[in-house]
UniProtKB/Swiss-Prot annotation:
Highest rank taxon of the organism: Bacteria
Keyword annotations of the record: Carbohydrate metabolism, Hydrolase, Manganese
Annotated source species: Finegoldia magna (strain ATCC 29328 / DSM 20472 / WAL 2508) (Peptostreptococcus magnus)
Annotated catalysed reactions: beta-D-fructose 1,6-bisphosphate + H2O = beta-D-fructose 6-phosphate + phosphate
Any one GO BP annotation for this protein: gluconeogenesis
Protein name (Swiss-Prot/TrEMBL): Fructose-1,6-bisphosphatase class 3
GO molecular function: fructose 1,6-bisphosphate 1-phosphatase activity
One Pfam family named in its UniProt record: FBPase_2
Amino acid sequence: MNNLKYLKLLAKEFPTIEQAANKIISLTSLSVLPKGTEYFLSDLHGQYDSFNRIIKSASGNTRIKIDLEFKDKLSESRKNQLANLIYDPKTIINITKENDEYTETWIRDTIFYLIRIAKRVASKYSRQKVRNQTPFYYRDLIDEMLNIQYESLNKKEYFNQLLDSIIKIEVSENFIITLCELIQDLNIDWLHIVGDIFDRGKRPDIIMDTLIAKKDVDIQYGNHDVTWIGAYLGSYVNACNVVRNAISYNNFQSLEDGYGINLRLLSTLADESYYDDPCERFKVRILDDNKHSETDLLHAARMHKAISIIQFKLENQLFKRNPEFEQLDRLYLERIDFKNGIYKDANGKAHALLDIKFPTVDPDNPLELTPSEQEVVECISKSFRTSHRLKEHMDFLFSYGSVYKIANSNLLFHGCIPMNKDGSFEEFTYQSNTYSGKSLLDFFEGIINSARNMDDNDPDRQTALDFFWYMWCGPKSPMFGKSKISTFENFFITDKDVRKEVSNPYFSLSKIEKYADKIFEEFNMNPETSHIINGHVPVKSINGEKPVSANGKTYVIDGGISEAYQKKTGIAGYTLTFNSHHLAIAKHKNFQVMESVHGAYTPEVTITEEFPKRMLIKDTDEGEEILELIEDLESLIDAYRSGTIQQNSN
């Protein structure tokens, strides 16, 4: 499109010199405001309770803002109560009512305090942005209250009259809730989720609901996310993998309650085929404190084994279908002597199997599903493909997700940029084309986008779906980054060498500054000002590991939000914050501690990089877009003045 055509389109939105000039003034003013605070989280793994607490408290930042605003003018108890109210207004209001404390005095004081906190939080934003973030039904009222200068006696009376009206017409509860939610919203300008929303934890669906409500968010796909996407799009092996992952943690809620996945046929198959099998190797992990009967746990173990065997068959079929995946050495089912219970590894070494009961496996054709297994797979897959709630969440994931993202000089991706030991980028060849570094990530981005839009009868569809399995656990997958995933070996083989998953050299090299710089150059980024931000590998804080390396250029922010990893990390996750003053890492305590100390909770915050001067919007990606629009509007004004384009004042 040439420049004149573009300016004519722009003229439809700004049809006069006055309107274009007004927009330039507005944009110029906006560009010199401080940049908003970005929050980075990774590896949520369905841990909705911890995630929601972190988000609603702005990673403890709300409590800090309350201290800054009120200092010693309010008691610690009152400040804690205010913090709790902001985090969970409905619950705290109900408690206040139960204690007969929901009085006119409490309402007036609370609204006044909340307005002060909201003013502090909103101070870095334009008035228009705050209005846009406010629900329309209270937009004018809250805007008025936020901009009243209390020093004037008349204004104080005016403010008190507004409070009187709120109380008189009995909307105080709804108004307080709205203020609290506005503070929550304004505290986080943008949220980056660096992969792995799904698996392990009970309710990834609740996390997705929170993200959809937030909107100002982006997501980088983790390997646990792409296997769910594959399941949703119709991949049998990914559907089985998702179900197996959930059952392995005795987590039926995420499947049945979250997305309505039908496990009835799987339950029946487990009872019929494994009725006399104790399934010792398939005992499920218990993370909650609820009591579980031995019968329920045994049944879960049998379901776990049943779906695992189906998955192994489908996985081996996939290896055979896709020789370019270079995983033919993973055809482990064909290396089993079922009669004698012996497995031969890729080097020919024999190992006794830890479990020799395979009632659904034909030793002469171990990759073939039985009719009952086929029925189970089709039923489960249909559930994934027809779940309305899953469709809503996957549509959001497609719209806001990507393999990687560059945002304000930060390179975000979940796992790794596959590398060789010498620091060169590892190559992946497919259909005679070779990909590495940035082009490899772009290749997988293309696979995801094309698979989403393929018809069921597309001849390339099966291969596209198989790639979601490769992204889950392929040796050159940037979401995975290991030589293999040893699910089969962990169930059946004792030898730790056979079980070993070798990590890609990236994970050690990225901690060295020169290799981080090499990655920045691959993505056309300035090594002097850029950062790598990823998750995937839990940082064992308990052993002294640090989330920041490469002279402050590489951040790994998987600190164990997922309860399943908290014993390994010793903490309950990291949040990286990027505000106008600095980059900082917040180290979170476990969720039980967060709950027990209520509004007093603040994480341990370490500033990792201070900026020489305050960063303004004009210094960000948004600022570049604003500058471009200002230049375009100036060109439009020139076109109006020269007569090249006619103004339209009608």
